[in-house]
A protein has these predicted regions:
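N-terminal Sec/SRP start-transfer signal
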Residues: 1-38, 57
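Loop-to-transmembrane-helix entry motif
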Residues: 19-23, 54, 264-274
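Hydrophobic, regular-secondary-structure patches
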Residues: 35-119, 142-148, 243, 247
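Hydrophobic side chains in well-ordered alpha-helices
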Residues: 51, 87, 130, 236-237
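Hydrophobic secondary-structure segments that place a key small or acidic residue at a functional site
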Residues: 102-103, 114-123, 137-209
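Mechanotransmission and gating elements of multispan inner-membrane complexes involved in transport
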Residues: 176-272
């Protein structure tokens, strides 16, 4: 059998180079096809990765912690305590690179001309900056200086619809834990630009401590967002956060929070494997 195999190999080799132009054209076509597949796979992987990163900037974070009923009813009644003890220790331990606790509640914002329903975000700018979840661009003015900043930052689209501008005062209204209206006047200190106009219209930024005081919730927060700068490895470190959080809090990865992005990533991985 070994001799037959050698004879077949010699005949095949001679046949290939009997018409060397044909063979070179075939090899060139195969090479171009292989490199085209590699290029397309890399391009699609890059597009998928960018889509996931953009999605995590909106969520944000690879893991989020909430009160178990918060996602179905995002009111201050379903707030959670600020991280302490074991949970705080887990958040400060590698591979976690950044985390931020924020107040996130539905609200109404009113100017002299109009009013709109929005999502009010009470943030600590330093923590959000480390998490990479600040607005893409500040068009006018500035962002909040700290968690006690008494100004608000609006999206450009929202500012146009409210017919307000930098330096003007607006009123923000929401509900406290007793279902009473909680409101305060704030000055617009910044106007931001986001990738999507819908985000500009939805999110209004304020100081976390200012909102906690307005809503009379003490140091409670709506959610904690956590990042380790590697969304593909989230399953390796998320269980430690879940164990530290205990049974009274809900800990979800980005794949559970955004099933569309997770499906896109799985499809891309399958395409690359094939």
């Amino acid at each position: 059998m070994g001799g037959v195999s050698r004879i077949v190999a010699v005949l095949a080799w001679r046949n290939l180079w009997r018409n060397y132009r044909r063979t070179l054209i075939m090899l060139l076509a195969i090479g171009i096809g292989v490199w085209a597949m590699i290029f397309m796979s890399a391009l699609m992987r890059g597009m998928t990765d960018q889509m996931v990163h953009n999605g995590l900037a909106v969520l944000p974070g690879e893991v989020q912690i909430h009160h178990p009923r918060y996602r179905s009813d995002p009111s201050v009644v379903n707030s959670m305590p600020s991280p302490t003890g074991e949970l705080l220790a887990a958040l400060e331990k590698p591979p976690v690179s950044a985390w931020a606790a924020r107040v996130r509640v539905p609200a109404v914002i009113a100017s002299e001309r109009d009013s709109r329903g929005v999502t009010l975000l009470g943030v600590d700018p330093a923590a959000e900056r480390a998490l990479g979840s600040l607005p893409d661009e500040i068009l006018q003015g500035r962002f909040l200086t700290d968690a006690a900043d008494r100004g608000v930052v609006l999206g450009a689209s929202l500012a146009r619809k409210l017919d307000t501008e930098l330096g003007k005062r607006v009123v923000i209204m929401s509900q406290d834990p007793d279902n009473n209206v909680a409101d305060r006047g704030s000055r617009v200190v910044g106007i931001y630009r986001a990738r999507l106009a819908s985000n500009e219209e939805q999110f209004v930024y304020a100081g976390r401590e200012v909102l906690q005081q307005m809503l009379t919730i003490g140091t409670a927060v709506s959610e904690v967002a956590v990042s380790a700068n590697d969304y593909r490895q989230v399953d390796s470190w998320a269980p430690a956060i879940e164990d530290a959080a205990g049974d009274n809090l809900e800990v979800l990865t980005w794949m559970e929070l955004d099933t569309f992005l997770s499906s896109m990533l799985s499809m891309q991985d399958g395409f690359t494997l094939i």
